[in-house]
């Protein structure tokens, strides 16, 4: 993937997406907005918003047995500058196997893949399915 190809994808996707799936609110947020373009992180993170009725509401990410890309690594009430007050669990696409920095595009050393907004949305839907399956 070239820098031009990635820039076209980033422009098309935008930096934020909100959707609902099976009654759960989901959020996708791009990291690094407003940073120096040369060093800016541009990977996506995905979050499912939990309510008090959910089994893992208020729990640390490392105690939650659900799987998402790279593992769950976020659980908190607040998310950056987002105003919503929900317990969020989530994951990021900034791992060694992911393209997350501009220099990775031209290094020739990386077999990393850019994880798209569609990919993150699919991962979030699978995460919601795990939450629902764990209710019974």
Where are these regions (language model features)?
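Polybasic, proline/glycine-rich intrinsically disordered low-complexity segments
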Residues: 12-22, 57-136
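Charged, compositionally biased non-catalytic regions
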Residues: 1-10
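Amphipathic, interaction-prone secondary-structure segments
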Residues: 10-66
């Amino acid at each position: 993937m070239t820098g031009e190809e990635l820039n076209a994808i980033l422009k098309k996707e935008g930096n934020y997406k909100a959707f609902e799936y099976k009654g759960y609110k989901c959020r996708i947020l791009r990291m690094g907005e407003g940073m120096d373009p040369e060093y800016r992180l541009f990977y996506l993170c995905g979050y499912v918003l939990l309510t008090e009725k959910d089994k893992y509401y208020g729990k640390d990410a490392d105690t939650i047995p659900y799987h998402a890309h790279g593992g769950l690594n976020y659980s908190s009430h607040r998310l950056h500058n987002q105003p919503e007050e929900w317990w969020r669990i989530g994951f990021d696409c900034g791992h060694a196997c992911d393209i997350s920095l501009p220099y990775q595009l031209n290094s020739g050393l990386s077999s990393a893949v850019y994880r798209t907004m569609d990919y993150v949305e699919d991962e979030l839907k699978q995460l919601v399915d795990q939450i629902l399956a764990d209710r019974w």
